[in-house]
C-alpha cells in the first residue's frame, strides 16, 4: 500500500489585482491599500467597487468610484469582494 501525498496547500491570496474582474477578499486578494495608475484606456474610466459579497446586488456595495486618473482604495478584511473594471493593475501599497 502506498501512502497518499498530502494535499497541496492553496495558493496565498495575491497582493496585486491584475485588472478586470471580481476578486474575493482573503481568497483571491489580500486586504490592504492598493494603488492604480488609472484607466487601461479600453473603457475611458476605471471603475472599482468594494462589496459585502460577490452577489453583484446593489445592496452589497460598500463603496465605489469611477476614476479618470490615478486612484487609491483600501480593501478591508471585512469586505467580501472587490471589483475592478477598465483599470490598470492595482498594486498593494500597504
Regions of interest found by a model, annotated:
Residues 1-17:
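N-terminal low-complexity, Pro/Thr-rich disordered segments
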Residues 19-21, 30-33, 78:
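A glycine-anchored, Pro-Gly-centered beta-turn/N-cap motif
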Residues 1-6, 40-94:
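Primarily secretory-pathway and cell-envelope proteins
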Residues 12, 16-22, 53-54:
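Extracellular beta-strand-rich, repetitive "passenger/adhesive" scaffolds
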Amino acid at each position: 500500500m502506498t501512502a497518499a501525498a498530502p494535499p497541496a496547500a492553496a495558493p496565498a491570496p495575491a497582493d496585486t489585482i491584475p485588472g478586470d474582474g471580481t476578486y474575493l477578499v482573503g481568497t483571491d486578494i489580500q486586504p490592504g491599500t492598493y494603488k492604480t495608475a488609472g484607466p487601461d484606456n479600453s473603457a475611458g474610466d476605471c471603475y472599482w467597487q468594494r462589496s459585502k459579497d460577490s452577489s453583484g446586488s446593489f445592496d452589497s456595495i460598500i463603496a465605489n468610484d469611477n476614476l479618470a486618473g490615478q486612484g487609491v482604495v483600501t480593501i478591508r478584511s471585512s469586505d467580501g469582494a472587490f471589483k475592478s473594471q477598465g483599470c490598470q493593475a492595482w498594486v498593494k501599497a500597504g
